[in-house]
Regions:
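Subtilisin-like serine protease catalytic core
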Residues: 1-95, 109-112, 124-125, 138, ...
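Short glycine-/small-residue-rich Rossmann-like dinucleotide-binding loops
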Residues: 28, 118-119
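Short, well-structured alpha-helical segments in soluble
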Residues: 98-110
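Alpha-helical segments flanking ligand/cofactor-binding loops in enzyme cores
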Residues: 104, 131-134, 158
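Active-site core of PLP-dependent enzymes with the aminotransferase class I/II
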Residues: 121-130
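Hydrophobic beta-strand scaffold residues
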Residues: 140-143
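Active-site glycine-centered loops adjacent to acidic/histidine catalytic or metal-binding residues
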Residues: 148
Length: 180
């Protein structure tokens, strides 16, 4: 059972009305952001994209004229958004202390899974966010993190903590070649 509330720490009551049976909570932890960006709204769409991959509702669509049904991995799951990033002129900022506060709130909210699609986690034993993930894991929460976009070489994977699932994407040309 979800223990949180659908509220904005930014003081905008309109965000509570955006909650529904899919989005059951929305929190902003962007405390260092300029005041106009302190909302739980997804400023660049990345969080919404990953949330739909994880928990998108089942929908019927047409793909090249063929009707198909698609959904996220867990279409009956509910989402609580914990916004920890905000836009800046140089791209964006995700402060570690904001992430730690959001993980602590997720533990209090009784979530089952945390999806953290933000790079980082250089040192599992000295990084505050990685240690917050350890607290979440100790509370019985599965933590899935981004492996990052730094490349295939050794040491380029983010979030190497043994208590998280570091998740990556790949592509494949579907060709298997063999020389005889």
């Amino acid at each position: 059972d979800y223990l949180g509330v659908c509220a904005s720490t930014g003081g905008d009551p309109d965000y509570a009305s955006a909650c529904n049976d899919k989005l059951v909570g929305a929190w902003s932890y962007t405390h260092d952001a300029p005041s106009e960006t302190v909302t739980p709204e997804d400023s660049d769409g990345h969080g919404s994209h990953t949330a739909s991959t994880v928990a998108g509702n089942t929908v019927d669509v047409e793909f090249f004229g063929v009707p198909v049904t698609i959904s996220g991995v867990a279409p009956h799951a509910q989402i609580i958004a914990y916004d920890v990033c905000y836009p800046t002129p140089s791209g964006g900022q995700c402060a570690g202390d904001d992430s730690v506060a959001a993980v602590q709130q997720a533990i209090l909210d009784g979530v089952d899974v945390i999806n953290y699609s933000i790079s980082g986690g250089e040192d599992p034993y000295n990084d505050a966010v990685e240690l917050a993930f350890l607290d979440a894991t100790a509370a019985g929460i599965t933590v899935s993190t981004s492996a990052g976009n730094s490349g295939p070489d050794a040491g380029t994977v983010a979030h190497r903590s043994p208590w998280v699932l570091s998740t990556a994407a790949t592509s494949h040309n579907r060709k298997f070649t063999h020389t005889v």
